[in-house]
């Protein structure tokens, strides 16, 4: 009698194991999908927290600060902007409001009399055109304000605005133009244009590749 009880108990245990295994292997498909989606959402959230409004190129996530650092690395001591603009200062100077962009980076020199500037606006898709117009007007205003200052005027006239995907970039660089000042205004403009082209080359490469 005891042996029969043991055999019965063993059969019950074995059946229980098979039932549990079957339930585990046969989870409803929608539950499996939901579990997978929850994992993916958690992973995406972790990625977004790793950087400040990053965008993704083929090499991974890149922030606007990393874009700036790439330009600084190429230009070296010829990159003079050093003070970040706040969103309020950006709006005051350019008319670009917070609702037009995802993120921005804007740097200028400490003294307003010195005009080396770089602005990168990650524009919202619906506002790319407005941001472009605002920066074109900003550029025209700087040219007008510096008509009586030859070296600054050359930098302003050499400035460039270029749109790369949803990134609207404004570069007004050149650093020390006195090294070509004795060759005339055309030489100073050409010198600054070359520095701006170098900066835009880096930005385009980082954003698109």
Placement of each model-derived feature along the sequence:
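Hydrophobic helical h-region of N-terminal Sec-dependent signal peptides
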Residues: 11-16
């Amino acid at each position: 009698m005891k042996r029969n009880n043991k055999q019965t108990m063993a059969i019950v245990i074995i059946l229980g194991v098979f039932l549990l295994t079957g339930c585990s292997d046969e989870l409803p498909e929608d539950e499996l999908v939901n579990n997978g989606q929850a994992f993916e959402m958690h992973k995406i959230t972790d990625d977004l927290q790793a950087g400040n409004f990053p965008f993704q190129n083929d090499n991974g996530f890149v922030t606007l600060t990393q874009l700036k650092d790439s330009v600084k690395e190429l230009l070296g001591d010829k990159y003079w902007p050093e003070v970040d603009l706040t969103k309020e200062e950006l709006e005051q100077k350019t008319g670009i409001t917070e609702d037009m962009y995802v993120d921005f980076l804007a740097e200028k020199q400490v003294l307003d009399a010195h005009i080396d500037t770089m602005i990168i606006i990650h524009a919202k898709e619906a506002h790319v055109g407005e941001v472009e117009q605002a920066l074109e007007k900003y550029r025209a205003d700087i040219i007008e304000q510096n008509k009586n200052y030859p070296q600054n005027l050359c930098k302003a006239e050499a400035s460039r605005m270029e749109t790369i995907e949803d990134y609207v970039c404004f570069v007004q660089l050149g650093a020390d133009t006195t090294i070509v000042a004795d060759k005339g205004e055309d030489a100073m403009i050409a010198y600054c244009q070359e520095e701006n082209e170098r900066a835009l080359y880096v930005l385009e490469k980082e954003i698109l590749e």
